[in-house]
A protein has these predicted regions:
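Vicinal oxygen chelate
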Residues: 2-9, 23-25, 31-34, 44-48, ...
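Hydrophobic ligand-binding cavity/cleft-lining segments
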Residues: 12-23
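Residues that cap or flank secondary-structure elements
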Residues: 9-10, 100
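Hydrophobic small-molecule pocket/channel-lining residues, especially in calycin-type beta-barrels
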Residues: 52
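Short, flexible/disordered intra-domain loops and linkers
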Residues: 93-103
Length: 145
């Protein structure tokens, strides 16, 4: 049996970064526990001080297939390249003609830029591969391929 995985992202503003990744991946912010209309209601009921309400956020695949992503506040800024990054596979893979993969990737890159991502280096093409390195709004690297 495979082990379930949760990805964890460090952030300065967990709520904002969670919203970005939810939109980027087609995920949704995790619902509050049963019996609570909102996370604010839950946190208030737990006695969590208001200044800590943005200490963390989580997003989930609405179909339940992908991993949960937990976004946690950290005090230090990002200072180096990620040791692990996500690849967003939107091109369709090697069975799709390269020109069509380029079109799909470029279209997704434009959408992600509209959400606040930045293009790190422009498109990279090697043999039959095509991808774009990007940064999320807090500088975490990811690729679109």
């Amino acid at each position: 049996m495979a082990t379930a995985v949760q990805l964890v992202l460090d952030a300065h503003d967990p709520a904002a970064l969670a919203r970005f990744w939810a939109a980027a991946l087609g995920y949704q912010i995790q619902d509050p526990p049963a019996g609570f209309e909102s996370w604010e209601d839950f946190l208030e009921a737990q006695g969590i001080p208001r200044e800590r309400w943005n200490d963390a956020s989580a997003l989930v695949d609405p179909e339940g297939k992908g991993p949960r992503i937990y976004v946690q506040r950290v005090p230090e800024p990002k200072t180096a390249k990620n040791r692990l990054h996500m690849d967003l596979n939107v091109g369709g893979g090697p069975r799709v003609e390269l020109d069509e993969r380029r079109r799909r990737v470029d279209e997704e890159v434009a959408r992600l830029k509209g959400l606040g991502a930045t293009d790190e280096r422009g498109a990279i093409e090697r043999d039959t591969e095509y991808w774009v390195r990007m940064n999320d709004p807090e500088g975490n690297e990811f690729c679109v391929q």
